[in-house]
Amino acid sequence: VSRFGASSLDVLENEPERLTEIPGITEKKAREMSESFRRQSGIRRLIEFLTAHRLPPELAVRLYRVYGELATDALRDDPYVLTDPYFHADFSLVDAFALELDVAADDERRVEAGILFELSYNLSNGHTFIPQPKLCAATAALLNLDTETIEAGLLRLTEQNRLVVDTVAGLQA
C-alpha cells in the first residue's frame, strides 16, 4: 500500500508485474499474489450474487471450483446446474431463483431438473422404482405443469441417455 497507495488493489488485480517494484517480490510471487487476490475477489462477488438471490453462500466455493470467474454467467445461463448433486442445492430455492431470472415455467431445463429431483427424492426415501405415470404426476404437481410437458421431458432425458425407462411387472418405470 505504501508503494502504490489508493491504486494498490488495481495493481494487484490488473498489473501484477508492477509488484516486482517492491524489493523481495519476484515475478512468480507477484503472479501468485495476483491470482490469489482475483480468486478471493471472485468468490466474494459470487457470494454477494448468491445471497442477493436468496441462495446459500456455501455454494460459492464449489461453483468457483467448477466455473471460476464465469460462475455468475453460468448461473444466469442455466440456473438448474445447481441441481447437480455436486452442489447439494435445494430444488425449491434453485427453481425460485430460475423463475426470478425469467426462465419460462415450461423450459426444458426446468422440466428435466424437476424430473431428476423427483427421482432423487423418491430414491432418498427408499423407493428404487417409481411407475412412470406416478413420476409424471408428481413432477407435474411440483412444477405446476401438465403431464404431457413432463412426459416430453422424460422422453428427452431417455434420448440423452440421462435416464433409463424399463418395464417391470407390466409397468413402465
What do the PLM-derived regions correspond to, one by one?
Residues V1-G170:
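Accessory alpha-helical DNA-binding modules that contact the DNA backbone or grooves
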